[in-house]
Protein backbone atom coordinates (compact mmCIF):
# COMPACT_ATOMS: atom_id res chain seq x y z
CA UNK A 1 0.00 0.00 0.00
CA UNK A 2 1.26 3.48 -0.86
CA UNK A 3 1.66 6.27 1.66
CA UNK A 4 -1.55 7.74 3.11
CA UNK A 5 -1.01 11.47 3.56
CA UNK A 6 -2.63 13.68 6.19
CA UNK A 7 -4.25 16.92 5.03
CA UNK A 8 -5.50 19.77 7.20
CA UNK A 9 -7.93 21.50 4.82
CA UNK A 10 -8.18 24.83 6.60
CA UNK A 11 -10.32 27.93 6.09
CA UNK A 12 -7.31 30.25 5.87
CA UNK A 13 -4.35 27.89 5.45
CA UNK A 14 -3.90 24.23 4.61
CA UNK A 15 -1.09 21.85 5.50
CA UNK A 16 0.02 18.38 4.39
CA UNK A 17 2.07 15.83 6.33
CA UNK A 18 3.23 12.24 5.95
CA UNK A 19 4.55 9.62 8.32
CA UNK A 20 8.34 9.58 7.91
CA UNK A 21 9.57 6.50 9.76
CA UNK A 22 7.58 6.63 12.98
CA UNK A 23 7.24 10.43 13.11
CA UNK A 24 4.87 12.71 11.20
CA UNK A 25 6.60 15.22 8.93
CA UNK A 26 5.13 18.42 7.47
CA UNK A 27 5.94 18.81 3.77
CA UNK A 28 6.97 22.16 2.28
CA UNK A 29 5.16 23.30 -0.86
CA UNK A 30 6.75 24.48 -4.13
CA UNK A 31 7.14 27.99 -2.65
CA UNK A 32 9.09 26.58 0.31
CA UNK A 33 6.25 27.21 2.79
CA UNK A 34 5.05 24.67 5.37
CA UNK A 35 1.46 25.89 5.03
CA UNK A 36 -0.45 26.88 1.90
CA UNK A 37 -2.97 29.73 1.81
CA UNK A 38 -6.45 28.30 1.09
CA UNK A 39 -6.93 30.87 -1.66
CA UNK A 40 -7.91 30.04 -5.24
CA UNK A 41 -7.84 32.56 -8.09
CA UNK A 42 -9.25 32.19 -11.57
CA UNK A 43 -7.46 34.26 -14.21
CA UNK A 44 -7.56 34.10 -18.00
CA UNK A 45 -6.94 30.44 -18.71
CA UNK A 46 -5.19 29.67 -15.43
CA UNK A 47 -6.09 28.60 -11.88
CA UNK A 48 -3.77 29.82 -9.12
CA UNK A 49 -3.62 28.29 -5.64
CA UNK A 50 -1.93 29.50 -2.46
CA UNK A 51 0.49 32.42 -2.31
CA UNK A 52 0.39 33.13 -6.09
CA UNK A 53 -3.41 33.49 -5.80
CA UNK A 54 -3.13 35.67 -2.71
CA UNK A 55 -0.57 37.98 -4.35
CA UNK A 56 -2.88 38.95 -7.22
CA UNK A 57 -6.05 39.32 -5.09
CA UNK A 58 -5.87 43.14 -5.02
CA UNK A 59 -6.18 43.36 -8.81
CA UNK A 60 -8.63 40.46 -9.17
CA UNK A 61 -10.88 40.51 -6.06
CA UNK A 62 -14.08 39.16 -7.62
CA UNK A 63 -12.36 36.04 -9.01
CA UNK A 64 -10.17 35.32 -5.98
CA UNK A 65 -11.92 32.88 -3.64
CA UNK A 66 -11.01 32.42 0.02
CA UNK A 67 -12.65 31.00 3.18
CA UNK A 68 -14.57 28.53 0.97
CA UNK A 69 -14.66 26.10 3.90
CA UNK A 70 -17.32 28.36 5.46
CA UNK A 71 -19.62 27.47 2.56
CA UNK A 72 -18.89 23.76 2.20
CA UNK A 73 -21.99 21.62 2.77
CA UNK A 74 -24.11 24.70 3.44
CA UNK A 75 -27.43 25.87 2.02
CA UNK A 76 -27.71 29.29 0.38
CA UNK A 77 -30.49 30.30 2.78
CA UNK A 78 -28.41 29.51 5.90
CA UNK A 79 -28.11 32.54 8.15
CA UNK A 80 -24.30 32.25 8.20
CA UNK A 81 -24.13 32.21 4.39
CA UNK A 82 -26.34 35.28 4.16
CA UNK A 83 -23.94 37.09 6.52
CA UNK A 84 -20.97 36.12 4.35
CA UNK A 85 -22.68 37.41 1.18
CA UNK A 86 -22.55 40.90 2.71
CA UNK A 87 -18.79 40.86 3.29
CA UNK A 88 -17.22 38.66 0.61
CA UNK A 89 -15.83 40.40 -2.51
CA UNK A 90 -16.73 37.39 -4.66
CA UNK A 91 -20.23 36.25 -5.61
CA UNK A 92 -22.03 33.63 -3.52
CA UNK A 93 -24.94 32.25 -5.55
CA UNK A 94 -27.80 29.81 -5.09
CA UNK A 95 -27.38 26.48 -6.88
CA UNK A 96 -30.33 24.66 -8.45
CA UNK A 97 -30.40 22.30 -5.45
CA UNK A 98 -30.38 25.20 -2.97
CA UNK A 99 -26.71 24.85 -1.95
CA UNK A 100 -24.40 27.84 -1.56
CA UNK A 101 -22.13 27.97 -4.62
CA UNK A 102 -19.70 30.64 -5.84
CA UNK A 103 -19.24 32.37 -9.16
CA UNK A 104 -15.93 33.31 -10.78
CA UNK A 105 -15.21 34.31 -14.37
CA UNK A 106 -18.92 33.85 -15.12
CA UNK A 107 -18.85 30.19 -14.08
CA UNK A 108 -20.83 28.78 -11.13
CA UNK A 109 -18.93 26.30 -8.97
CA UNK A 110 -19.73 24.14 -5.95
CA UNK A 111 -17.69 24.68 -2.77
CA UNK A 112 -16.22 21.12 -2.90
CA UNK A 113 -15.11 21.78 -6.49
CA UNK A 114 -13.19 24.89 -5.39
CA UNK A 115 -11.75 23.22 -2.27
CA UNK A 116 -10.54 20.40 -4.52
CA UNK A 117 -8.05 22.86 -6.06
CA UNK A 118 -6.37 23.27 -2.66
CA UNK A 119 -6.40 19.50 -2.13
CA UNK A 120 -4.81 19.01 -5.56
CA UNK A 121 -1.95 21.30 -4.52
CA UNK A 122 -1.55 19.34 -1.27
CA UNK A 123 -1.50 16.09 -3.26
CA UNK A 124 1.14 17.47 -5.68
CA UNK A 125 3.25 18.78 -2.77
CA UNK A 126 3.29 15.30 -1.23
CA UNK A 127 4.01 13.60 -4.57
CA UNK A 128 6.97 15.91 -5.26
CA UNK A 129 8.41 15.07 -1.84
CA UNK A 130 7.77 11.31 -1.96
CA UNK A 131 8.62 10.87 -5.64
CA UNK A 132 5.57 8.68 -6.20
CA UNK A 133 1.86 9.04 -6.94
CA UNK A 134 -0.36 9.58 -3.91
CA UNK A 135 -3.98 8.43 -3.92
CA UNK A 136 -4.87 7.87 -0.25
CA UNK A 137 -5.50 10.65 2.25
CA UNK A 138 -6.88 11.36 5.70
CA UNK A 139 -8.58 14.77 5.63
CA UNK A 140 -9.47 16.71 8.76
CA UNK A 141 -12.70 18.60 9.44
CA UNK A 142 -13.92 20.66 12.38
CA UNK A 143 -15.32 18.34 15.06
CA UNK A 144 -18.62 20.21 14.89
CA UNK A 145 -19.09 19.67 11.13
CA UNK A 146 -22.45 18.05 10.37
CA UNK A 147 -23.13 15.15 7.99
CA UNK A 148 -23.56 17.37 4.91
CA UNK A 149 -20.29 19.22 5.58
CA UNK A 150 -18.38 15.95 6.07
CA UNK A 151 -19.85 14.46 2.90
CA UNK A 152 -18.97 17.63 0.95
CA UNK A 153 -15.36 17.39 2.22
CA UNK A 154 -15.16 13.78 1.01
CA UNK A 155 -16.55 14.94 -2.34
CA UNK A 156 -13.79 17.57 -2.57
CA UNK A 157 -11.19 14.83 -2.02
CA UNK A 158 -12.74 12.67 -4.71
CA UNK A 159 -12.77 15.56 -7.19
CA UNK A 160 -9.07 16.15 -6.41
CA UNK A 161 -8.28 12.54 -7.35
CA UNK A 162 -7.89 11.31 -3.77
CA UNK A 163 -9.39 8.29 -2.08
CA UNK A 164 -10.40 9.69 1.30
CA UNK A 165 -9.52 6.84 3.66
CA UNK A 166 -10.88 8.64 6.69
CA UNK A 167 -12.40 11.94 7.77
CA UNK A 168 -10.96 12.84 11.18
CA UNK A 169 -11.87 15.65 13.56
CA UNK A 170 -9.29 18.44 13.83
CA UNK A 171 -8.96 18.51 17.64
CA UNK A 172 -8.63 14.71 17.69
CA UNK A 173 -5.86 14.93 15.09
CA UNK A 174 -4.05 17.55 17.18
CA UNK A 175 -4.31 15.28 20.22
CA UNK A 176 -2.81 12.40 18.21
CA UNK A 177 0.15 14.56 17.18
CA UNK A 178 0.62 15.80 20.75
CA UNK A 179 0.17 12.53 22.62
CA UNK A 180 1.95 10.11 20.30
CA UNK A 181 5.39 10.42 21.93
CA UNK A 182 4.35 11.66 25.39
CA UNK A 183 5.30 9.46 28.32
CA UNK A 184 3.92 9.56 31.82
CA UNK A 185 0.71 7.58 31.82
CA UNK A 186 -2.90 8.64 31.44
CA UNK A 187 -3.94 12.22 30.83
CA UNK A 188 -7.11 14.15 30.02
CA UNK A 189 -6.56 16.96 27.57
CA UNK A 190 -8.67 19.83 26.28
CA UNK A 191 -8.02 20.84 22.68
CA UNK A 192 -9.15 24.42 22.00
CA UNK A 193 -9.13 24.83 18.21
CA UNK A 194 -9.81 28.33 16.90
CA UNK A 195 -8.93 28.40 13.22
CA UNK A 196 -9.63 30.70 10.32
CA UNK A 197 -13.34 29.96 10.07
CA UNK A 198 -14.36 27.38 12.65
CA UNK A 199 -14.09 26.72 16.38
CA UNK A 200 -13.98 23.38 18.22
CA UNK A 201 -13.39 22.16 21.72
CA UNK A 202 -12.74 18.48 22.40
CA UNK A 203 -12.10 16.73 25.70
CA UNK A 204 -9.88 13.71 25.03
CA UNK A 205 -8.61 10.98 27.33
CA UNK A 206 -5.25 9.38 26.52
CA UNK A 207 -4.78 5.98 28.18
CA UNK A 208 -1.62 3.91 27.91
CA UNK A 209 -1.67 0.18 28.61
CA UNK A 210 1.44 -1.92 27.90
CA UNK A 211 2.72 0.51 25.28
CA UNK A 212 -0.60 0.83 23.43
CA UNK A 213 -2.23 4.24 23.51
CA UNK A 214 -5.97 4.80 23.30
CA UNK A 215 -7.19 8.26 22.35
CA UNK A 216 -10.83 8.45 23.42
CA UNK A 217 -12.89 11.56 22.73
CA UNK A 218 -15.18 12.10 25.71
CA UNK A 219 -17.05 15.13 24.36
CA UNK A 220 -16.89 17.72 21.64
CA UNK A 221 -18.60 21.02 20.93
CA UNK A 222 -18.06 24.12 18.85
CA UNK A 223 -19.21 26.69 16.33
CA UNK A 224 -18.64 26.08 12.62
CA UNK A 225 -18.92 29.77 11.83
CA UNK A 226 -16.51 31.35 14.30
CA UNK A 227 -12.87 31.94 13.48
CA UNK A 228 -10.07 34.28 12.45
CA UNK A 229 -12.06 35.56 9.46
CA UNK A 230 -14.63 36.98 11.92
CA UNK A 231 -11.85 38.69 13.88
CA UNK A 232 -10.51 40.13 10.60
CA UNK A 233 -13.96 41.39 9.63
CA UNK A 234 -14.36 43.29 12.91
CA UNK A 235 -11.09 45.12 12.24
CA UNK A 236 -11.96 45.68 8.56
CA UNK A 237 -15.29 47.26 9.53
CA UNK A 238 -13.55 49.48 12.09
CA UNK A 239 -10.99 50.70 9.52
CA UNK A 240 -13.69 51.35 6.91
CA UNK A 241 -15.83 53.25 9.45
CA UNK A 242 -12.86 55.38 10.56
CA UNK A 243 -12.05 56.21 6.94
CA UNK A 244 -15.68 57.14 6.26
CA UNK A 245 -15.74 59.45 9.29
CA UNK A 246 -12.58 61.19 8.11
CA UNK A 247 -13.09 61.28 4.33
CA UNK A 248 -16.86 60.80 3.87
CA UNK A 249 -16.25 57.89 1.46
CA UNK A 250 -17.64 54.37 1.94
CA UNK A 251 -14.97 51.91 0.78
CA UNK A 252 -17.44 48.98 0.89
CA UNK A 253 -18.58 49.84 -2.64
CA UNK A 254 -15.01 49.51 -3.99
CA UNK A 255 -13.85 45.84 -4.23
CA UNK A 256 -10.22 46.78 -5.01
CA UNK A 257 -9.99 49.07 -2.00
CA UNK A 258 -11.67 46.47 0.23
CA UNK A 259 -9.15 43.83 -0.80
CA UNK A 260 -6.30 46.15 0.23
CA UNK A 261 -8.04 46.90 3.54
CA UNK A 262 -8.55 43.16 4.14
CA UNK A 263 -4.85 42.42 3.63
CA UNK A 264 -3.85 45.34 5.85
CA UNK A 265 -6.28 44.22 8.59
CA UNK A 266 -4.89 40.66 8.55
CA UNK A 267 -1.34 42.03 8.83
CA UNK A 268 -2.29 44.44 11.63
CA UNK A 269 -4.07 41.69 13.60
CA UNK A 270 -0.97 39.48 13.44
CA UNK A 271 1.35 42.37 14.41
CA UNK A 272 -0.83 43.20 17.43
CA UNK A 273 -0.08 39.76 18.88
CA UNK A 274 3.54 40.91 19.33
CA UNK A 275 3.27 44.69 19.72
CA UNK A 276 0.94 47.05 21.56
CA UNK A 277 0.06 49.24 18.55
CA UNK A 278 0.44 49.42 14.78
CA UNK A 279 -0.33 51.80 11.92
CA UNK A 280 -2.56 50.81 9.02
CA UNK A 281 -1.19 52.97 6.23
CA UNK A 282 -2.71 52.61 2.74
CA UNK A 283 -1.70 55.37 0.32
CA UNK A 284 -4.03 56.00 -2.64
CA UNK A 285 -6.64 53.60 -1.27
CA UNK A 286 -9.28 55.44 -3.32
CA UNK A 287 -10.00 58.83 -4.90
CA UNK A 288 -12.84 61.28 -5.39
CA UNK A 289 -13.28 64.28 -7.69
CA UNK A 290 -10.93 66.40 -5.58
CA UNK A 291 -7.89 64.18 -5.01
CA UNK A 292 -6.53 60.72 -4.18
CA UNK A 293 -7.34 59.57 -0.63
CA UNK A 294 -5.02 57.79 1.81
CA UNK A 295 -5.87 55.67 4.83
CA UNK A 296 -3.81 56.13 7.97
CA UNK A 297 -5.32 54.64 11.12
CA UNK A 298 -3.51 53.85 14.36
CA UNK A 299 -4.77 50.62 15.96
CA UNK A 300 -3.84 49.56 19.50
CA UNK A 301 -4.02 46.05 20.90
CA UNK A 302 -6.60 47.31 23.40
CA UNK A 303 -8.78 48.59 20.53
CA UNK A 304 -8.61 45.27 18.69
CA UNK A 305 -9.47 43.41 21.89
CA UNK A 306 -12.52 45.62 22.46
CA UNK A 307 -13.67 44.89 18.88
CA UNK A 308 -13.49 41.11 19.28
CA UNK A 309 -14.14 40.56 22.98
CA UNK A 310 -17.60 39.08 22.38
CA UNK A 311 -16.16 36.63 19.80
CA UNK A 312 -13.63 35.33 22.33
CA UNK A 313 -16.39 35.12 24.93
CA UNK A 314 -18.54 33.20 22.43
CA UNK A 315 -15.83 30.54 22.24
CA UNK A 316 -15.98 29.92 26.00
CA UNK A 317 -19.62 28.75 26.09
CA UNK A 318 -18.92 25.49 24.19
CA UNK A 319 -16.12 24.77 26.71
CA UNK A 320 -18.68 24.63 29.53
CA UNK A 321 -21.00 22.37 27.50
CA UNK A 322 -18.17 19.98 26.53
CA UNK A 323 -16.99 19.64 30.14
CA UNK A 324 -20.56 19.00 31.32
CA UNK A 325 -21.09 16.40 28.56
CA UNK A 326 -17.85 14.66 29.59
CA UNK A 327 -18.97 14.83 33.24
CA UNK A 328 -15.71 16.55 34.19
CA UNK A 329 -14.61 19.78 35.85
CA UNK A 330 -11.71 22.05 34.88
CA UNK A 331 -9.65 20.43 37.66
CA UNK A 332 -9.79 17.09 35.79
CA UNK A 333 -7.99 18.56 32.75
CA UNK A 334 -4.25 17.80 32.83
CA UNK A 335 -3.20 19.62 29.64
CA UNK A 336 -4.66 22.37 27.47
CA UNK A 337 -3.63 22.48 23.81
CA UNK A 338 -4.20 25.47 21.54
CA UNK A 339 -4.66 24.80 17.83
CA UNK A 340 -5.37 27.20 14.94
CA UNK A 341 -3.66 30.45 14.01
CA UNK A 342 -6.12 32.67 15.91
CA UNK A 343 -4.93 31.16 19.22
CA UNK A 344 -1.74 33.22 18.86
CA UNK A 345 -3.76 36.25 19.99
CA UNK A 346 -2.72 37.05 23.60
CA UNK A 347 -6.32 37.77 24.64
CA UNK A 348 -7.43 34.30 23.48
CA UNK A 349 -4.54 32.66 25.37
CA UNK A 350 -5.34 34.64 28.52
CA UNK A 351 -9.08 33.85 28.46
CA UNK A 352 -8.48 30.13 27.91
CA UNK A 353 -5.87 30.04 30.71
CA UNK A 354 -8.31 31.87 32.99
CA UNK A 355 -11.11 29.40 32.17
CA UNK A 356 -9.04 26.25 32.78
CA UNK A 357 -6.93 27.70 35.59
CA UNK A 358 -3.71 26.72 33.81
CA UNK A 359 -1.52 27.91 30.95
CA UNK A 360 -1.79 26.11 27.63
CA UNK A 361 1.07 23.90 26.41
CA UNK A 362 3.70 25.68 24.32
CA UNK A 363 5.14 22.59 22.62
CA UNK A 364 2.41 22.30 19.97
CA UNK A 365 2.62 24.16 16.66
CA UNK A 366 -0.93 25.52 16.17
CA UNK A 367 -0.58 25.57 12.36
CA UNK A 368 0.88 22.08 11.89
CA UNK A 369 -0.43 19.82 14.67
CA UNK A 370 -3.67 18.92 12.86
CA UNK A 371 -1.98 17.79 9.62
CA UNK A 372 0.61 15.84 11.64
CA UNK A 373 -2.14 14.04 13.54
CA UNK A 374 -3.89 13.22 10.25
CA UNK A 375 -0.61 11.71 9.01
CA UNK A 376 -0.45 9.56 12.16
CA UNK A 377 -3.99 8.32 11.46
CA UNK A 378 -2.88 7.64 7.88
CA UNK A 379 -0.08 5.50 9.33
CA UNK A 380 -2.59 3.63 11.51
CA UNK A 381 -4.82 2.89 8.50
CA UNK A 382 -1.82 1.81 6.39
CA UNK A 383 -0.67 -0.55 9.15
CA UNK A 384 2.55 1.39 9.81
CA UNK A 385 1.46 2.44 13.32
CA UNK A 386 0.20 -0.46 15.41
CA UNK A 387 0.04 0.80 18.99
CA UNK A 388 -2.56 3.56 18.61
CA UNK A 389 -6.34 3.23 18.91
CA UNK A 390 -8.54 6.22 18.15
CA UNK A 391 -12.11 6.43 19.45
CA UNK A 392 -13.89 9.51 18.10
CA UNK A 393 -17.47 10.69 18.61
CA UNK A 394 -20.36 12.16 16.66
CA UNK A 395 -20.71 15.85 17.56
CA UNK A 396 -24.49 16.12 17.08
CA UNK A 397 -27.48 13.89 17.79
CA UNK A 398 -29.18 12.06 14.93
CA UNK A 399 -32.84 11.15 14.67
CA UNK A 400 -36.05 11.35 12.68
CA UNK A 401 -39.12 13.56 12.68
CA UNK A 402 -42.12 11.93 14.36
CA UNK A 403 -45.74 12.98 14.92
CA UNK A 404 -46.26 16.57 15.98
CA UNK A 405 -43.00 17.80 14.45
CA UNK A 406 -40.88 16.27 17.21
CA UNK A 407 -37.32 15.02 16.69
CA UNK A 408 -36.87 11.50 18.07
CA UNK A 409 -33.17 10.78 18.63
CA UNK A 410 -31.65 7.45 17.63
CA UNK A 411 -28.00 8.40 18.21
CA UNK A 412 -27.13 10.84 21.00
CA UNK A 413 -24.34 13.39 20.58
CA UNK A 414 -20.87 12.34 21.79
CA UNK A 415 -21.58 8.67 20.98
CA UNK A 416 -18.37 6.84 20.03
CA UNK A 417 -18.21 6.04 16.32
CA UNK A 418 -18.62 3.86 14.36
CA UNK A 419 -22.00 2.99 15.87
CA UNK A 420 -25.33 1.45 14.96
CA UNK A 421 -28.75 2.21 16.45
CA UNK A 422 -32.27 1.10 15.60
CA UNK A 423 -35.81 1.83 16.65
CA UNK A 424 -39.23 0.57 15.62
CA UNK A 425 -41.77 3.05 14.26
CA UNK A 426 -45.29 2.64 12.94
CA UNK A 427 -47.97 4.36 10.85
CA UNK A 428 -49.99 7.39 11.94
CA UNK A 429 -53.13 6.57 9.94
CA UNK A 430 -55.25 3.51 9.11
CA UNK A 431 -54.32 1.59 5.94
CA UNK A 432 -51.27 3.76 5.36
CA UNK A 433 -49.23 2.17 2.55
CA UNK A 434 -46.16 4.43 2.76
CA UNK A 435 -44.27 6.47 5.35
CA UNK A 436 -41.93 9.42 4.89
CA UNK A 437 -38.87 9.24 7.08
CA UNK A 438 -37.25 12.65 7.63
CA UNK A 439 -33.67 12.34 8.95
CA UNK A 440 -32.39 15.15 11.19
CA UNK A 441 -29.20 16.21 12.97
CA UNK A 442 -29.14 18.54 15.95
CA UNK A 443 -30.14 19.01 19.59
CA UNK A 444 -33.54 20.79 19.42
CA UNK A 445 -36.78 19.00 20.31
CA UNK A 446 -38.62 20.75 17.50
CA UNK A 447 -37.68 19.07 14.23
CA UNK A 448 -37.86 22.30 12.22
CA UNK A 449 -34.93 23.82 14.13
CA UNK A 450 -32.53 20.96 13.36
CA UNK A 451 -30.44 20.31 10.25
CA UNK A 452 -32.34 18.27 7.66
CA UNK A 453 -30.12 15.55 6.21
CA UNK A 454 -32.78 14.38 3.79
CA UNK A 455 -35.86 12.23 3.61
CA UNK A 456 -37.08 9.09 1.90
CA UNK A 457 -40.32 7.17 1.41
CA UNK A 458 -40.77 3.57 2.44
CA UNK A 459 -43.55 2.17 0.29
CA UNK A 460 -45.42 -1.12 -0.04
CA UNK A 461 -46.57 -1.35 3.59
CA UNK A 462 -49.50 -3.80 3.91
CA UNK A 463 -52.83 -2.10 4.81
CA UNK A 464 -53.46 -2.26 8.55
CA UNK A 465 -54.89 -0.15 11.38
CA UNK A 466 -52.67 2.71 12.54
CA UNK A 467 -49.91 1.68 14.92
CA UNK A 468 -49.92 -1.94 13.76
CA UNK A 469 -47.19 -2.09 11.06
CA UNK A 470 -43.71 -2.31 12.53
CA UNK A 471 -40.99 -0.48 10.63
CA UNK A 472 -37.48 -0.84 12.05
CA UNK A 473 -35.25 2.09 11.14
CA UNK A 474 -31.49 1.53 11.53
CA UNK A 475 -28.91 4.32 11.67
CA UNK A 476 -25.38 3.21 10.79
CA UNK A 477 -22.81 5.91 11.53
CA UNK A 478 -19.41 5.14 10.01
CA UNK A 479 -15.93 6.09 11.23
CA UNK A 480 -16.03 9.26 9.10
CA UNK A 481 -19.14 10.40 10.98
CA UNK A 482 -21.28 9.92 7.86
CA UNK A 483 -24.74 8.38 8.17
CA UNK A 484 -26.25 5.42 6.31
CA UNK A 485 -29.89 4.46 6.86
CA UNK A 486 -31.78 1.22 6.29
CA UNK A 487 -35.40 0.23 6.96
CA UNK A 488 -37.11 -3.12 7.46
CA UNK A 489 -40.80 -4.00 7.45
CA UNK A 490 -40.88 -6.49 10.33
CA UNK A 491 -44.19 -8.01 9.25
CA UNK A 492 -42.92 -9.19 5.88
CA UNK A 493 -39.28 -9.50 6.89
CA UNK A 494 -38.43 -7.57 3.75
CA UNK A 495 -35.44 -5.26 4.23
CA UNK A 496 -34.55 -2.25 2.18
CA UNK A 497 -31.23 -0.43 2.13
CA UNK A 498 -31.90 3.23 1.66
CA UNK A 499 -29.47 5.90 0.64
CA UNK A 500 -30.56 9.30 1.86
CA UNK A 501 -30.88 11.68 -1.05
CA UNK A 502 -30.38 14.94 0.76
CA UNK A 503 -31.99 17.93 -0.89
CA UNK A 504 -28.53 19.47 -1.13
CA UNK A 505 -25.07 18.14 -1.89
CA UNK A 506 -23.54 16.89 -5.10
CA UNK A 507 -24.90 13.87 -6.93
CA UNK A 508 -22.56 11.08 -8.07
CA UNK A 509 -22.97 12.27 -11.67
CA UNK A 510 -21.99 15.83 -10.72
CA UNK A 511 -18.96 14.61 -8.79
CA UNK A 512 -17.91 12.36 -11.67
CA UNK A 513 -18.22 15.28 -14.09
CA UNK A 514 -16.05 17.44 -11.81
CA UNK A 515 -13.49 14.62 -11.48
CA UNK A 516 -13.31 14.41 -15.28
CA UNK A 517 -12.97 18.21 -15.54
CA UNK A 518 -10.17 18.12 -12.98
CA UNK A 519 -8.44 15.34 -14.95
CA UNK A 520 -8.87 17.30 -18.18
CA UNK A 521 -7.40 20.38 -16.51
CA UNK A 522 -4.55 18.26 -15.17
CA UNK A 523 -3.80 17.10 -18.71
CA UNK A 524 -4.10 20.67 -20.01
CA UNK A 525 -1.78 21.92 -17.24
CA UNK A 526 0.74 19.20 -18.09
CA UNK A 527 0.65 20.13 -21.78
CA UNK A 528 1.01 23.82 -20.90
CA UNK A 529 4.06 23.04 -18.74
CA UNK A 530 5.61 20.90 -21.49
CA UNK A 531 4.98 23.64 -24.08
CA UNK A 532 6.55 26.27 -21.79
CA UNK A 533 9.61 24.02 -21.30
CA UNK A 534 9.93 23.50 -25.08
CA UNK A 535 9.67 27.27 -25.70
CA UNK A 536 12.32 27.98 -23.05
CA UNK A 537 14.62 25.38 -24.61
CA UNK A 538 14.05 26.98 -28.03
CA UNK A 539 14.90 30.43 -26.61
CA UNK A 540 18.14 29.13 -25.10
CA UNK A 541 19.03 27.36 -28.36
CA UNK A 542 18.40 30.48 -30.47
CA UNK A 543 20.39 32.72 -28.12
CA UNK A 544 23.30 30.26 -27.78
CA UNK A 545 23.50 29.58 -31.54
CA UNK A 546 23.57 33.29 -32.46
CA UNK A 547 26.32 33.89 -29.92
CA UNK A 548 28.40 31.01 -31.32
CA UNK A 549 27.90 32.24 -34.93
CA UNK A 550 29.20 35.65 -33.86
CA UNK A 551 32.20 34.13 -32.06
CA UNK A 552 33.02 31.80 -35.00
CA UNK A 553 33.28 34.76 -37.38
CA UNK A 554 34.92 33.96 -40.73
CA UNK A 555 35.82 30.44 -39.59
CA UNK A 556 32.22 29.41 -40.34
CA UNK A 557 31.62 28.81 -44.07
CA UNK A 558 28.96 31.07 -45.64
CA UNK A 559 26.92 28.04 -46.74
CA UNK A 560 26.68 26.72 -43.15
CA UNK A 561 25.87 30.19 -41.86
CA UNK A 562 22.90 30.45 -44.26
CA UNK A 563 21.62 27.01 -43.19
CA UNK A 564 21.85 27.99 -39.52
CA UNK A 565 20.09 31.35 -40.03
CA UNK A 566 17.26 29.61 -41.93
CA UNK A 567 16.91 26.99 -39.14
CA UNK A 568 16.91 29.73 -36.47
CA UNK A 569 14.20 31.62 -38.34
CA UNK A 570 12.05 28.47 -38.63
CA UNK A 571 12.50 27.72 -34.91
CA UNK A 572 11.44 31.28 -34.02
CA UNK A 573 8.25 30.83 -36.05
CA UNK A 574 7.53 27.43 -34.44
CA UNK A 575 8.16 28.88 -30.97
CA UNK A 576 5.32 31.37 -31.46
CA UNK A 577 2.84 28.53 -32.02
CA UNK A 578 1.27 26.02 -29.59
CA UNK A 579 2.63 22.84 -31.18
CA UNK A 580 5.28 21.34 -28.89
CA UNK A 581 6.19 18.63 -31.42
CA UNK A 582 6.82 21.28 -34.09
CA UNK A 583 9.12 23.19 -31.71
CA UNK A 584 11.01 19.99 -30.82
CA UNK A 585 11.42 19.15 -34.53
CA UNK A 586 12.81 22.62 -35.33
CA UNK A 587 15.20 22.42 -32.34
CA UNK A 588 16.48 19.13 -33.77
CA UNK A 589 16.77 20.70 -37.24
CA UNK A 590 18.81 23.58 -35.83
CA UNK A 591 21.12 21.14 -34.02
CA UNK A 592 21.68 19.28 -37.31
CA UNK A 593 22.35 22.52 -39.22
CA UNK A 594 24.78 23.64 -36.50
CA UNK A 595 27.10 20.61 -36.59
CA UNK A 596 29.92 22.50 -38.37
CA UNK A 597 29.42 25.40 -35.95
CA UNK A 598 29.75 23.03 -32.96
CA UNK A 599 33.04 21.68 -34.35
CA UNK A 600 34.43 25.21 -34.79
CA UNK A 601 33.26 26.22 -31.30
CA UNK A 602 34.96 23.14 -29.84
CA UNK A 603 38.22 23.86 -31.72
CA UNK A 604 38.18 27.47 -30.54
CA UNK A 605 37.57 26.35 -26.95
CA UNK A 606 40.48 23.88 -27.11
CA UNK A 607 42.79 26.50 -28.63
CA UNK A 608 41.78 28.97 -25.93
CA UNK A 609 42.45 26.39 -23.20
CA UNK A 610 45.89 25.60 -24.66
CA UNK A 611 46.74 29.30 -24.89
CA UNK A 612 45.61 29.77 -21.29
CA UNK A 613 47.95 26.92 -20.22
CA UNK A 614 50.96 28.50 -21.99
CA UNK A 615 50.26 31.86 -20.37
CA UNK A 616 50.01 30.23 -16.95
CA UNK A 617 53.37 28.48 -17.45
CA UNK A 618 55.00 31.76 -18.60
CA UNK A 619 53.50 33.51 -15.59
CA UNK A 620 54.98 30.85 -13.31
CA UNK A 621 58.45 31.42 -14.81
CA UNK A 622 58.07 35.17 -14.39
CA UNK A 623 57.47 34.66 -10.68
CA UNK A 624 60.96 33.14 -10.12
CA UNK A 625 63.14 35.54 -8.06
CA UNK A 626 66.95 35.49 -8.46
CA UNK A 627 68.72 35.56 -5.08
CA UNK A 628 72.29 35.24 -3.83
CA UNK A 629 72.93 32.43 -1.36
CA UNK A 630 75.71 32.35 1.14
CA UNK A 631 76.93 28.93 2.14
CA UNK A 632 76.49 28.31 5.83
CA UNK A 633 79.54 26.77 7.43
CA UNK A 634 79.00 24.13 10.05
CA UNK A 635 80.76 26.17 12.70
CA UNK A 636 78.38 29.04 12.13
CA UNK A 637 75.31 26.98 12.88
UniProtKB/Swiss-Prot annotation:
UniProt keywords, alphabetically: ATP-binding, Chaperone, Nucleotide-binding, Phosphoprotein, Stress response
Induction annotation: By stress conditions e.g. heat shock.
TM stretches of this protein: none
Modification Phosphothreonine occurs at: 198
Biased composition (Low complexity): 606-616
GO MF annotation list: ATP binding; ATP-dependent protein folding chaperone; unfolded protein binding
SUPFAM superfamilies in alphabetical order: Actin-like ATPase domain, Heat shock protein 70kD (HSP70), C-terminal subdomain, Heat shock protein 70kD (HSP70), peptide-binding domain
Residue ranges, annotated region (Disordered): 606-637
Acidic residues bias (residue ranges): 623-637
Function: Acts as a chaperone.
Membership in a protein family: Belongs to the heat shock protein 70 family.
Name the record gives this protein: Chaperone protein DnaK
Species of origin: Vibrio proteolyticus
Designated gene of the protein: dnaK
Amino acid sequence: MGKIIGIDLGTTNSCVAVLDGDKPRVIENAEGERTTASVIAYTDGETLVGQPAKRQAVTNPTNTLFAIKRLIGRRFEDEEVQRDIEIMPYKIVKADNGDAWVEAKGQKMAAPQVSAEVLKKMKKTAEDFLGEEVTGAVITVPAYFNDAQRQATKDAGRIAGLEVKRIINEPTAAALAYGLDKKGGDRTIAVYDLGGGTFDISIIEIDEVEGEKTFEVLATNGDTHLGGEDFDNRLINYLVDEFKKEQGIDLKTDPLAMQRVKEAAEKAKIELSFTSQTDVNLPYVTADATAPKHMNVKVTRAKLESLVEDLVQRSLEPLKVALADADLSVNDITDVILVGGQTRMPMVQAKVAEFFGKEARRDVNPDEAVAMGAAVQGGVLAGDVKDVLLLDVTPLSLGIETMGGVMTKLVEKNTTIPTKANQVFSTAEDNQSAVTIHVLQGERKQAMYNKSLGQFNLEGIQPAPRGMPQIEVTFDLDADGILHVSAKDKQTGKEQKITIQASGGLSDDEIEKMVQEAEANKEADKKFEELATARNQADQMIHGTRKQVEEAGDALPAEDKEKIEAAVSELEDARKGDDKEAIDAKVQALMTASQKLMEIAQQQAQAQAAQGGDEAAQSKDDDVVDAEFEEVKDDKK
